[in-house]
């Protein structure tokens, strides 16, 4: 679970998400500032963990979930007629379907995808390791709390797709706009691929492995922040793995709130719209029979898709990285 401070901050932000949390933009790593890190598909135990299902939409990502439909974050925008590029092919947006209970948007395209991502339909996201994909900002200048390294500000945007890992530690109610969110925290012990999100990572797909393969469990939505080293001024967006002594903006009280200097690091993190709890809405949009000219799955993949489409299964940047603007990730 996240630290007590992180949990209380996340809940406080949940009450004000619609007013603007920082949206996400780019995958930022604890282990390295190398902008070329993790810019090719994962291999080994992470092979086929979602890279093959990432498309480009409005400068962010979109993820095919059916022959003629892809899933994205609503807050990044878009219009009918705009292009969606997937697997080297450009498709045209034909219609939008917005979820009234979350930040999700389903986009229908002209044409048919050769493959699409299976959805996670279970209820065991918490504790699961994840792989997340996004375009956006790299790691910038170091942030210190006194003499202690706390994290890094958001850097520049190189527009390159990257991937990272983390663990889902909680689900959080983000309020009427954002709905149910998966929460992952940025820590010093997250391994070589441990990451946070930033501006440009919004709409990035979050995949987990349920034992039968990698499934789409979330769509990147927002991040904790912004932060400050004092209680005045505009502050800054950052990936912070130890927020002790720093200030974080409280959208409810419209003031900087200092994070206590306790004995343990206070991690902050990112949020993704929880896909599983919106399964019935997704199923209401996607036709019960596949539409398109290319067979997408066979075997277990087809069985899983059939469960979703027939209704037998169960299921957060245009901006700045995860919950930004105080919060969403665009």
Residues covered by each model-derived region:
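C-terminal subregion of chymotrypsin/trypsin-like serine protease catalytic domains
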Residues: 27-53, 60-77, 163, 195-291
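Catalytic-histidine neighborhood of serine endopeptidases
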Residues: 66-67, 71-102, 112, 125, ...
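A cross-kingdom C-terminal cell-surface attachment/processing module
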Residues: 299-321
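Cytoplasmic C-terminal tails of single-pass
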Residues: 321-330
């Amino acid at each position: 679970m996240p630290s007590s401070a992180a949990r209380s901050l996340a809940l406080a932000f949940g009450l004000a998400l619609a007013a603007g949390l920082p949206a996400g933009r780019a995958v930022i790593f604890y282990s390295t500032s190398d902008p070329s890190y993790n810019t090719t598909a994962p291999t080994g135990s992470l092979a086929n963990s979602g890279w093959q299902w990432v498309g480009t939409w409005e400068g962010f990502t979109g993820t095919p979930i059916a022959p003629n439909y892809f899933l994205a974050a609503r807050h990044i925008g878009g219009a009918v007629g705009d292009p969606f590029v997937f697997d080297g092919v450009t498709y045209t947006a034909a219609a939008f379907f917005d979820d009234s209970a979350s930040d999700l948007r389903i986009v229908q395209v002209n044409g048919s995808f050769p493959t699409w991502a299976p959805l996670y339909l279970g209820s065991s996201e918490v504790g699961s390791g994840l792989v997340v994909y996004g375009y956006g900002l790299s790691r910038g200048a170091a942030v210190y709390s006194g003499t202690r390294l706390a994290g890094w500000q958001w850097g520049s945007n190189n527009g390159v797709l990257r991937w990272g890992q983390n663990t889902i530690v909680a689900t959080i109610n983000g309020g009427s706009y954002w709905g149910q969110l998966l929460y992952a925290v940025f820590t010093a012990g997250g391994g070589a691929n441990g990451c946070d999100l930033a501006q440009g990572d919004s709409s990035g797909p979050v995949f987990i492995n349920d034992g039968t393969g990698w499934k789409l469990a979330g769509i990147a939505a927002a991040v904790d922040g912004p932060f400050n080293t004092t209680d005045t001024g505009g502050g800054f967006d950052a990936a912070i793995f130890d927020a002790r002594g720093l200030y974080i903006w409280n959208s409810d009280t419209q003031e900087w709130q200092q994070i206590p200097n306790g004995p343990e690091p206070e991690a902050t993190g990112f949020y993704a719209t929880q896909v599983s709890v919106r399964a019935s809405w997704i199923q209401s949009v996607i036709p019960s029979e596949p539409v398109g000219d290319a067979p997408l799955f066979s075997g277990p993949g087809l069985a899983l898709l059939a469960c979703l489409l027939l209704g037998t299964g169960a299921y957060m940047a245009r901006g700045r990285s995860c919950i930004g603007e105080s919060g969403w990730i665009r």
